[in-house]
Each structure stands twice: as C-alpha cells, then as structure tokens.
Amino acid sequence: AGPYDRIGLHRYRASGPSVATLLYLPGTNMNGAAALTEEKYNLWLYLAARGIEVYALDYRTHSVPPDASPDQLKALKDWTSAVFVADIAAAADFARQTGGHDKLFVAGFSRGAFLAYAFANTAPDRVAGLVVLDGPFKALSAGAFDRAPSLADLEASGTWASDVGGSKGWEARQALMQAVIADPDAPAADPQFKSIGDQLAHVLQTAWLPGGLANPEGGMSRPAVLARLLKDYDRWYPAVQDVDGKTIASSANAPETDLDDLWGKFQTPILLFASTGMGGDWVINAVHSAVHSGSGDVTLNVLERYGHLDVLVGEQAAAEVFEPTAAWIKARAP
C-alpha cells in the first residue's frame, strides 16, 4: 500500500440507541468531515438528531495533500471505481458492526450516488435502501463508449488526477472561499460586483449550466454557506473514474465490470432527489437509473430550481430533502 491508500470514517450520532445506520458517500472532491455544523445545512447532523446514525466516508483522496507533485499523483492511476467500492465495502462492514444494524442504508451525493449504486450491486444483502442525492448511474440513451482509447489517452497524458481548482487554480479558489466566509459583504475583487459574496454567487451560478452547480442568484442558497462547503473540498480526484462512469452509463450491463451486474434486477428500495438545474438529460438519467433498476420500491423527488449543491445546503433542503429522507429511512428500517 502507498502513503495515500487509506480511508476514514466520521461517525455522527445522538445519545441513546439508533433506529438505523446510514453510510454516506460524498461527491467528487468531498469528504466526511462536517464543514457545516448547523443541522439545517447538514444532512448527517439532521439525521443523527433523529436517531439515524451516520457514518460519512473519507475517500483515499482525502489523504492526498493539495501540493502533491505530479510524481506523487501517479498514485491515483489505479484508484478505479472498483477500488473505491472495495473501500466502501470495508467501511460498510465497520458501520454495520459498530452501529449494531445488520443492514444499513447507503446515501450518495453526485458521484457518491454512482458509487452507492455500484456498492449495492456488489452487496445487496447488506443494503436496506439507497438514498440517491442528485446522481445517475445509467444513461437512458447513451451511445456506445469504447473504454480502451480513453484509457490510452489518460496513459499518454500522464494526468491521473483531476484538479478541482480548474483553470483559476487551487490557491485562487481557496482565497475566494476564505474571503466570502470572512465577510460576504466585503468589496469584490472584480469591480462589476458589489460584494465578494455576489462575485462568488455569480461564479457558482455560471460554473456549469446556468444555475446548475448552485442557484444562489435565484435565492435557493447563500454564498457564505456555499463557501464554507466548498472550502473544505479535497483538491484531487482520480481521472480514471470518469472513464469508469462512462463505461457503466453507456450500457445496461457493461461487460468490463461487475459493478452493474444486478442493475435491472435490484430489490433494494431507492429514494431519489434530482435537481432541475443540472438540465433535462441529468434528471432523465437519474430517474431512469432508479425506475429501471428493478426495484419495486422507488420514490422520486424532482427539485425545481435547485442547483446541484442546493440539494445539500439550499435554504429549503432541510424541509424538502432532509425531512423526507428521515421519514423514508424510518419507514424502511429493518
């Protein structure tokens, strides 16, 4: 094992016995540490206060330092989705044994939703239900995807890690988040905005589709809250998992992997939340992944005007995501 081949688990619980155990799988570049400690902005704390014990995972990426060199980042070359699913299985076994529930619920946000589906494919006897927070597993009308050339391109580039800093750079990203956290009403670095909070709101509003990443300009979330969430991201993520995702999404049963072998024959209950801000194809694929999974117990929630991050930290998330999730889990707790 290399220096970064380790995972972590954060346990969130109230005093007294729990009614259920939930394993939470973060999105790309996210981790299991509580960046936000108010219950209305943190699903883990909301559930824990209501008797649902939560174990939030740190992927191996949490161990990789932000200033890792290209040579050090070669460690991410073999961090495939299958490797992460094996890590998730180890975390699930620990959570089951520690929490005292033979079956656990698994929640995943974004890429974590993809990994939640994959884990449930490999360990259906251990999963009481899936909480899918704005993420697809399969695509309704994906074209054929040839994995080999994509892997060859990765090999040729030598870029085994994607950088959440993007074109603006990690340091500039972090400085913007820190400035908004310190005082969202402070003057903006860009004079076209009246405050640094407004500047971040516009950056997030236009990062993907308009309102796709978040919809603060539409009043669905607050820049200062989003900044606190984003500041604690991990910088690096294995690029090979983008290839894995396209491989699995492109067919009902990808021959290159066993991570989707049970899709279409699922018997696991599924609770889905999908944000409209991510676009029509995103919603269609998220719904398709749940409805055609094979499960006879699928609950769908399409969140109008929500951006991706608003599902976690939006002003209405506690009422429209957290509360229904708690009720759904309690109704299905073994």
Predicted regions and their residues:
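Alpha/beta-hydrolase active-site loop
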Residues: K74-T98
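Alpha/beta-hydrolase
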Residues: D146-M278
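Short, surface-exposed "cap/lid" segments of acyl-processing enzymes
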Residues: S15-H62
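N-terminal cap/lid segment of alpha/beta-hydrolase-fold proteins
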Residues: A1-P17
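Alpha/beta-hydrolase fold nucleophile elbow
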Residues: G99-S110
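Conserved loop-alpha-helix segment in the C-terminal half of the alpha/beta-hydrolase fold
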Residues: A274-L303
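Short glycine-enriched nucleophile-adjacent loop
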Residues: A113-P124, L130
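Catalytic active-site module of serine/aspartate enzymes centered on a nucleophile-bearing elbow/loop
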Residues: D258-L259, D297-P334
